[in-house]
Amino acid sequence: MELSDVHCLSGSEELYTIHPTPPAADGGSGSRPQRLLWQTAVRHITEQRFIHGHRGGGGGGSRKASNPAGSGPNHHAPQLSSDSVLPLYSLGSGERAHNTGGTKVFPERSGSGSASGSGGGGDLGFLHLDCAPSNSDFFLNGGYSYRGVIFPTLRNSFKSRDLERLYQRYFLGQRRKSEVVMNVLDVLTKLTLLVLHLSLASAPMDPLKGILLGFFTGIEVVICALVVVRKDTTSHTYLQYSGVVTWVAMTTQILAAGLGYGLLGDGIGYVLFTLFATYSMLPLPLTWAILAGLGTSLLQVTLQVLIPRLAVFSINQVLAQVVLFMCMNTAGIFISYLSDRAQRQAFLETRRCVEARLRLETENQRQERLVLSVLPRFVVLEMINDMTNVEDEHLQHQFHRIYIHRYENVSILFADVKGFTNLSTTLSAQELVRMLNELFARFDRLAHEHHCLRIKILGDCYYCVSGLPEPRQDHAHCCVEMGLSMIKTIRFVRSRTKHDVDMRIGIHSGSVLCGVLGLRKWQFDVWSWDVDIANKLESGGIPGRIHISKATLDCLSGDYNVEEGHGKERNEFLRKHNIETYLIKQPEESLLSLPEDIVKESVSCSDRRNSGATFTEGSWSPELPFDNIVGKQNTLAALTRNSINLLPNHLAQALHVQSGPEEINKRIEHTIDLRSGDKLRREHIKPFSLMFKDSSLEHKYSQMRDEVFKSNLVCAFIVLLFITAIQSLLPSSRLMPMTIQFSILIMLHSALVLITTAEDYKCLPLILRKTCCWINETYLARNVIIFASILINFLGAVINILWCDFDKSIPLKNLTFNSSAVFTDICSYPEYFVFTGVLAMVTCAVFLRLNSVLKLAVLLIMIAIYALLTETIYAGLFLSYDNLNHSGEDFLGTKEASLLLMAMFLLAVFYHGQQLEYTARLDFLWRVQAKEEINEMKDLREHNENMLRNILPGHVARHFLEKDRDNEELYSQSYDAVGVMFASIPGFADFYSQTEMNNQGVECLRLLNEIIADFDELLGEDRFQDIEKIKTIGSTYMAVSGLSPEKQQCEDKWGHLCALADFSLALTESIQEINKHSFNNFELRIGISHGSVVAGVIGAKKPQYDIWGKTVNLASRMDSTGVSGRIQVPEETYLILKDQGFAFDYRGEIYVKGISEQEGKIKTYFLLGRVQPNPFILPPRRLPGQYSLAAVVLGLVQSLNRQRQKQLLNENSNSGIIKSHYNRRTLLTPSGPEPGAQAEGTDKSDLP
């Protein structure tokens, strides 16, 4: 059978959604939302996962995230997994103190579902979760269906051989069990007959009968033993062969009975039992079962005609037997086909569940990769370990935290590409981005070889640190070697591209603080006085040389020749702070010797003539950004032994995870090996009644639509027709009452069929179709129809006995088939009342979805009625038949044999019903669990999209997620009209200090985090939705407007530039508000410019979105040459903004490094504010903001915890989800422990 969602005329929500809940409260639209603790917000997000997933029936549309500020969490976990809530696991030993600071959490924007932060809504497209293939995509032949009624076909298999093999293996245990039960039932019947014979028979048993009885019993016992003992080696094919052997044994017994060597009369009842068992209990394909059923029927009819002792007395009796066997074969075909269909449906649901869980793992892997594209592994490990140990009762006491690490004895390298500005004007966008990606990919490779950690790429600036996170005694040597290799590489670039480029490198040794600040566009960074010195060493250096400080020289221990650097002469900072500098002396021939990998590529490509931007075409080529995150192959990195010690045990599992049919099939094989169905049954289903232990789950199951209910009812109607035909061939002596009664029964059953299939006939009245729909969707109504159908068939089987006249029963003993006296009154053949009663019992088996306990109750009532009729009211009819037609060798009368036959059918039908109901309920459980996994997957996808939007603009994220990028170029884009803003805090350098009072600078960074977070919050207002934050550089905030493709064709061409100007004004107001609360006097120095830029994504391991061009350099210079507390713009920008309602003050002409050399001094203006409001800009209204990095990492931890909880349930409670499914690797693969890292700070309250 198939259990499907409701799809009635008026529609309905999916019934297997466990707890539909009302939508969460919205966050409101105030200009300043209430601040939240990130732990509280993330706990709310976690608890709302299923609420969002089930809202709207779990449809595939976009979903709005609720604002946790509006209301507290309202936990509605699915009942199926409600028992799986386990406490979080602590690390045990090895915990370290963590530094804390202030970050804020705000939910994602509403109104556009998964809309990106920069315009352009819609799903970013991580996974199309609701596009799973339908059953017809799997089946080779799904059967013939007409008006909702499914008719059997001979072939019912999957298209895929592997899928068919897995299906056969999946239900091998159940079919093995059915084979054993069938043989045991037959053996018990034989033993019962043997005991009755020994007790009741007047004469001893014929030796040949005893031998045959023992032989057939032995065969069936051996089959049972082989199937039970050798179950691990019993394949599906061998099980089919054992079924054939069982059928041969039973059919041979029919032959023996026909020859007079059986224990039951003429054996017609045993033939019916054999036919039913062949179709419903023996593990035979439908084609084999049909051939076996026809063979058994033909054998019995032949014996009845040819064997003298069994000779029938009329053609009507022969036809009645033929119709009887036809009816049993027809019902058996329906039962076998629809049962197999139900099992295949359950198997597909199992596969979908496994597939959903596999895809959930893939989503987790993507999320981990996204985190690792922002943070180094050791920081992620620190956050995960800390968050894993967060207890619910402590969440309320956790204040804003940041994760800042302090590392001593490190060396910092800054490198800048000289001549890059001119290069960016001569290359196309694609060539520029390709060149940068290849260049920085080589730098990343060199950094790995020289034990350096790349921190960030700032335009054409690259900086890295050695000694972080693993302390190294040779950190200074590593940076110097890194610098020398970079110079060799850039010189190779210069020789290949014919562009005048070089490297200016500065190195300083000391200590750093590292971590992530802000709420948007997370980027790992380092801060300290020593970082500033390294930066100034680079800017005051000489192209092609390595400029080092005295501190670095001391760490080199004289291993390199140096000369005076005279950095004070080239840089004001170095002169002001009296920093001694040196230049590494390196023989020119050493610099001309290229790195080994470049030499190999150059040799292999020596015949190339290429003066373009691409300089690497050899065997090595840089990876494309995000290929390891959103690519098709999602393989995980292995955990090192040291890194495993840093993770909680349940997060350090290792399993190679792939996606695709092969991996799904492997998972299903694991499921089969662990006999998951039996485990699910023990956990969720009651032993005898098979009802769910969870009442709400039972209610949902009972309301599931039964797609084969119409087919079952049609089959029951066919059985009634056969019963009518049998009793018409052997009619009652009173034809008129019999004709009336069967006419009424047929009309009643026809009405039942009509009322249950009416919804497929549009020509019928609407009220009738709605009634039909209601019946199909209502458990009680379906049961009423089922019981009415069974009652009609039962009445058809027994009602004719009411017209029998005891005085007119005629002896048939001495008549032959050719006798002139033909007696066709059914009262002369009372056993046919029993045979048709058996057909009525089989009607119960036809209704696959009927509860097995109800089936048992109905069967017991039938047997009780038959016992009443045969043993009391109509006992004389059966006794008269036995006296006249049975020999003295028959130790059982027709009454007793009939009750024994019905008892056999009762057990067989009940067991078959139990198997079918278990299959249906297992199917339902898999659906519920798969639905839960898909809902959780959707939440994870939203998490991933949030993370990706915090790395890339929304339209760029969609570029990487929606397209087939197998052969795609790097992402690059040219823009003609973009606004660029740099906002720095000049006073923060003087404010920053590394003393014991401020925890070695940590408290200063805590304040900087608050400032950046407030700036990020402003971007959550819809008036600034055209603005994208690019990065923070120390205490400098960089933002851009006009990047969204959707806004490029907007009528208000410079509306985004006006929004950028408004944003800069809002920043000045925000910093003033911060000054009030922190008792500081910070001022912003802001520079704005506009023009053309090149945007692109570079870096494979740590992808980074950036923009380049003269406009960027000019905006940066507008900041660096500006005045604190003022907003400086060039004349071109002034001319645009002055017509948009902004007021300015002319500053004058200033010298701008890198631009004035070619264009002379630049006229600049100070932006004062707005003269008049812009009518196109709405009043400030806060959109739900972004999740903080801590929030997303905690979401990842809680997702992994939920998986671990399910795994523990599977191991301890045998929940039936494959054990190996959750034994998975994580991406958190650090190089080793961090004994040199000092985690700074503790939890502290907000700043005053």
Swiss-Prot record:
Changing residue 66 to A: Decraeses significantly the stimulatoty effect of PKA inhibitor on calcium-stimulated adenylate cyclase activity. The lineage of its organism: Eukaryota, Metazoa, Chordata, Craniata, Vertebrata. The keyword rRNA-binding does not apply. This is Adenylate cyclase type 8. The keyword Cytoplasm does not apply. Changing residue 1209 to E: Does not affect calcium activated adenylate cyclase. Does not affect calmodulin binding. InterPro entries: A/G_cyclase, A/G_cyclase_CS, AC_N, Adcy, Adcy_conserved_dom, Nucleotide_cyclase. Phosphorylated by PKA; mediates inhibition of adenylate cyclase activity at membrane raft; does not influence either CALM1 or PPP2CA interaction with ADCY8. The gene is Adcy8. One of its GO terms (molecular function) is metal ion binding. Residues 1197-1212 are annotated as: Required for both calcium stimulation and maintenance of autoinhibition. Changing residue 112 to D: Insensitive to the stimulatory effect of PKA inhibitor on calcium-stimulated adenylate cyclase activity.
